[in-house]
Each structure stands twice: as C-alpha cells, then as structure tokens.
A protein has these predicted regions:
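Conserved helicase RecA-like core
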Residues: 1-187, 195-197
C-alpha cells in the first residue's frame, strides 16, 4: 500500500448564502410533556401549515394518534404508510386542507411545499445534516420561516448544541407558559468556583 504525502483533509461547512431566512428556537420540557408542549405551541402561535419530524416511525404514528385524539387535524408519513394513503395525505397538505403533517426523515424525502409556516423537531435529529434538511422545508420562496426543537432530556440538548455549532446557527431557547405566551429563556451563568483559603 502506498501513502501519499500530499493528501489533505477537506471539511465542507454550510455557506451563509445557502441558508434560508429561518428563526430558530428551542423549548425544554420533560419527556412526558413533549406532546402537550408541542400541541400548545401549535395552537397558541396560530401556525397554518406545520411539518413535525420524529426520528422513528413508531413515534411518528404515536404522536399523530395523540394529536388526533386531542382534536388536531393531522396525518403522518412513515415507512408503513401505503402509497395510496401517502398520496391522499400529501394532496391534502399541499392544498392547505391539512394543517399538520408528522413525518420521519425518510418518508419526507421528495416533499416540495413552499409555504410551510413552521417546522418542529419533535425529536432532535441524530445527524447534523438532517437538521439542515428538516428546517429547510420552511423559509422557502423568500418567505420567513420558523423552526422549533423540543428538548426532552440532556442528550437532546447536547445534540442540538452540537448542531448549532456545526451549522453556525443561533437557536434561541424559549419558555412557553401554560396560556401559550412565549418568552426568552434566561440563561443562568454557572456559579463561580469556591475559593479555598488556607
């Protein structure tokens, strides 16, 4: 095996001009509060066309079922959805008759809808590139978009911080009150180390 001395490693980062105009936020809650928090966010902000991403088809179906029981008009797309049902769902979503679509990354490939008001990462994606692709569903055709990430545990927060650093994005932590009011989360400075006196 031959080794070349002129080999170099190239790292490709997203270009600033490639980034759409999207305001990015996060909400932190307990894992058991994620569905209720997401539902309250959608209803309180008046989004008309929302795309929600889950990492697994099981969570995708479960979340859609929970939302339907809560009275939200939504459908889901994942690997177990038959083609006929998928086409029917997409026709409703594209026409604006379906306000909320819950999908996995794989099932959402090929979806091309320009006027998505909001993208919600119900699960923080496992790959940095998935985040970029997900939020790229909003903020199209020179429209301003909004992207939310729902944080349910520390690993999700750590992953979102990694994504923000990799993509050079600013993701503003927010607090959603029980009555649907949004405020910026106050980031507390870490406590100063205690000095030991001898």
């Amino acid at each position: 095996m031959l080794f070349r001395s002129d080999e170099v490693e190239i790292t490709v980062e997203p270009k600033q001009e490639d980034k759409p105009d999207i305001d990015q936020f996060s909400l932190t809650c307990t894992p058991l509060e994620k569905a209720e928090t997401t539902l309250r966010l959608i209803k309180s902000q008046g989004y008309e066309r929302v795309m929600i991403f889950c990492n697994t088809k099981h969570m995708c179906q479960r979340l859609c079922d929970d939302f339907q029981r809560a009275g939200l008009d939504c459908e889901c797309l994942h690997g177990d959805i038959r083609q006929q049902q998928r086409e029917k769902t997409m026709q409703r979503y594209r026409s604006g008759k379906l306000p909320v679509l819950v999908a996995t990354d794989v099932a959402s490939r090929g979806i091309d809808v320009d006027d998505v008001d909001c993208v919600i990462n119900y699960d923080v994606p496992e790959e940095n590139e998935y985040y970029v692709h997900r939020i790229g569903r909003t903020g199209r055709a020179k429209r301003k978009g909004v992207a939310w990430s729902i944080i349910g545990n520390f690993p999700e927060k750590a992953k979102l911080d990694e994504i923000a650093k990799f993509s050079n994005y600013t993701i503003q932590p927010m607090v959603l009150s029980p009555d649907g009011q949004l405020t910026k989360e106050e980031v507390k400075a870490p406590p100063a180390p205690k000095r030991r006196f001898r």
